[in-house]
Amino acid sequence: MWRCGGRQGLGVLRRLSGGHAHHRAWRWNSNRACERALQYKLGDKIHGFTVNQVTSVPELFLTAVKLIHDDTGARYLHLAREDTNNLFSVQFRTTPMDSTGVPHILEHTVLCGSQKYPCRDPFFRMLNRSLSTFMNAFTASDYTLYPFSTQNPKDFQNLLSVYLDATFFPCLRELDFWQEGWRLEHENPRDPQTALVFKGVVFNEMKGAFTDNERIFSQHLQNRLLPDHTYSVVSGGDPLCILELTWEQLKQFHATHYHPSNARFFTYGNFPLEQHLKQIHEEALSKFQKIEPSTAVPAQTPWDKPREFQITCGPDSFATDPSKQTTVSVSFLLPDITDTFEAFTLSLLSSLLTSGPNSPFYKALIESGLGTDFSPDVGYNGYTREAYFSVGLQGIAEKDIETVRSLVDRTIDEVVEKGFEDDRIEALLHKIEIQMKHQSTSFGLMLTSYIASCWNHDGDPVELLKLGNQLAKFRQCLQENPKFLQEKVKQYFKNNQHKLTLSMRPDDKYHEKQAQVEATKLKQKVEALSPGDRQQIYEKGLELRTQQSKPQDASCLPALKVSDIEPTIPVTELDVVLTAGDIPVQYCAQPTNGMVYFRAFSSLNTLPEELRPYVPLFCSVLTKLGCGLLDYREQAQQIELKTGGMSASPHVLPDDSHMDTYEQGVLFSSLCLDRNLPDMMHLWSEIFNNPCFEEEEHFKVLVKMTAQELTNAIPDSGHLYASIRAGRTLTPAGDLQETFSGMDRVRLMKRIAEMTDIKPILRKLPRIKKHLLNGDNMRCSVNATPQQMSQTEKAVEDFLRSIGRSKKERRPVRPHTVEKPVPSSSGGDAHVPHGSQIIRKLVTEPTFKPWQMKTHFLMPFPVNYVGECIRTVPYMDPDHASLKILARLMTAKFLHTEIREKGGAYGGGAKLSHNGIFSLYSYRDPNTIETLQSFGKAVDWAKSGKFTQQDIDEAKLSVFSTVDAPIAPSNKGMDYFLYGLSDGMKQAHREQLFAVSHDKLLAVSNRYLGTGKSTHSLAILGPENPKIAKDPSWTIR
């Protein structure tokens, strides 16, 4: 996977949500792993490594142990923390000097087989032989990272063995290079009369990546600002330059870059360090001697005067104003990221300059009305050796480029003169305190990503983690010099000659020109072929297709057994009590580290139908327009000072027993330090009772930003949009899901953003508020420590008594609603006093009939996103478990080969959602009709039963790795709160998963897949397709 970017701001502190179930208890009150690690001493010799630093980092509850490998000089960092979700990563400094994508294609190809594990594609096969909570690989601008995580010690050793062999001893076969990188091949590899075309997974991935105008801008920004060395090229590969890479060059790059002397090893969690060191030394490092890698990145030569560049991109078909599609930014080169305190200071400074409606650049640029949103890469970018700061606007008229540049300069002058308000600095430091206390299930992954860039350039990763020291020093600098930050702005922005103004305008023929250049390149390569070359291409194509189609013996790979999976789930203790009369509140006592997490769910059943499409917009602006006596700036300041964020989001929650029944509502979410709980609940009180819907100008700004963000998300999420659309006509909830989260929402926001008079939309918000922001049909949830519960109960009760209630009961808009009490299980998962259980008010449509719809959304992309959805059964139906295993089986044993390996798409597969919709999808796919045919073949394959018990067991392991993914303390009990899923119901489903057999898979394949057009729907996002255009059964949008 290629990523243009890395650590931005305080990336380590960004919250990542947990999974949907947790298999082992969190033990943050224990520090056994830290204490064990503190026993190591400087100079200790352990399995070929020498300890050279042991440091306690109490603010992150960990002990850091730095080591060096004696024979190779390989660096090693172990972070001991009492976390069961253990992580390993190995990182190589990869510094390409051209845009052929060699590090990216190498990242793909090393995972295609190795000396110890010579079977094809061991990486993807391990997804089904493991209980990993994460497996992937990333190519950044100057390093390549291979991380995995798991909670199972045996699994950790298995995955470590595969990763070590893949990275240090890969096969690097020519056919794998052809498949993953690029190749010339006949359109139909079995017919030499068909045209020769370019194919390859990375080739298509990068074509897809550069359909995203934000990616194009970000890539050029880095290339132009840092032109001297490796940052001047595209590490992921420019599609047209990829076509120049040879297999020999790939092997040479591995030989010079994938060596222990150029490697950094990282482990995290509560597994013993000695076992890791022993295995890494014996299986990999003992076979190497030290070299001096010539991979260092030299410092960029500073400019003596600012520079300007203009680039072009494809047009935005969702632009709210076609004459305003230009992007411009002003960027400044900053110091080396290995100066950790300076990097920390500049990261904070960046947030003060650009984050939220009180920041100087928000006021000057966003509220100018010139554009729709900040330019890409706004703020501090710390993922290159020297960081940079960038700020500007997208969605502007070309004539306003100079105006934006002047506004940037003027804002810098004002900040130098006036500085920042104390409250804004305190709010930012409060945010850091919250983020240090908040516990993510993916903390190890966050840490390895956070330290990667600094460590890559020989900075001290442990210093980077000592956030307490950095904060103390920052406060001291401010105290000793009140103009500390103003002087930084003057030094790095006002007086900085290394300054780039980059502008990007749309070219209506951009994609056409790119296609023409590719066609010319193809013509040149084809014309240069001799008859012998053509014959060799034909034979190689046949050989590759034969290899892809041949059953692979993966017995060489290590694997867990189904018996390694825990048979039962742990109990989650919950208390549900009625508060303020009849509002159920769920309390979940957890080790939240001094944090309180509050949520409320409010039903939309009484909301008039014509207001329903505007609910997502209502949610996105609710906490940003002001409330009570606070205007929107003051509200933003209070939210930053007193909470870790307050948000609202629409939800369509499926029933667990009926496909045509669902719950609709809005989830309100927030978190805070326990000392600020009364203030947070008071803010919710004001938002519910006295929201401000009069600020028309700021509402316009928020509408434009939302519309722009939705449009920008399409290239990365096209497969999700296709699946949501394809599921629209299969269940009653599907139509609402499309309204809330699909292309219908994107198009509606575009229309609203285009309106010259936005008052009619603004007037809808108080009407929605009347039905939503009250105590009717509401339930609440709190996660906090046991010690905080009494204080929490009082604060929540005060909030619930303060909010309005309807004088008379409003009738639901939909005629059929049912009241469904949420069950409590005998397993002790929820203590529910008699008469106070949660009652969900569900919408049901007993006469609903599914129907088929085929939609092709025309997009200016050179790749496609294809989705097919099939209506099956709800969660509690025993067939749901079989279909879940079947989806994984079809992905691993059929669709991966057909769609990715043969078809060249970046991704594809099958999945079963909680709502009973079975989806087949592809991502960044050069094909459409062929992919739909592959979906059909996958169904035929499933119905044929050509899979073994070993295949079924592997699919179960893969499914359980998701089912048993860790859940953070903040998210415990959420399945019960939102979906009504008790531990007893989840245990029953778990037993159904264990019981899935060959006969059951065969039965559900024949019963649900391919049974009739009415239960299937299709959607595609992508370029025009002549075959689809001629087919009257398709709707073209």
Curated annotation (Swiss-Prot):
- The UniProt record lists the EC number as 3.4.24.-
Q: Where is the composition biased (Basic residues)?
A: 804-814
Q: Does the keyword Glycoprotein apply?
A: no
Disulfide bond annotation, renumbered to this chain: C119-C556
CC per GO annotation: mitochondrial matrix
Give residue numbers for the modification (N6-succinyllysine).
K770, K849, K946
Compartments (UniProt record) = Mitochondrion matrix
Q: Which residues carry this modification: N6-acetyllysine?
A: K759, K770, K884
Q: Is the keyword Zinc in the record?
A: yes
Report the activity regulation comment.
Mainly exists in a closed and catalytically competent conformation but a closed-to-open switch allows substrate entry into the catalytic chamber. Substrate binding induces closure and dimerization. A disulfide bond may lock the enzyme in a closed conformation preventing substrate entry into the catalytic chamber, participating in redox regulation of the enzyme. Inhibited by metal-chelating agents. Inhibited by nickel and zinc excess, and slightly activated by manganese.
Q: Example GO molecular function term?
A: metalloendopeptidase activity
Q: What does this protein do?
A: Metalloendopeptidase of the mitochondrial matrix that functions in peptide cleavage and degradation rather than in protein processing. Has an ATP-independent activity. Specifically cleaves peptides in the range of 5 to 65 residues. Shows a preference for cleavage after small polar residues and before basic residues, but without any positional preference. Degrades the transit peptides of mitochondrial proteins after their cleavage. Also degrades other unstructured peptides.
Please give the name of this protein: Presequence protease, mitochondrial
Q: Which gene encodes it?
A: PITRM1
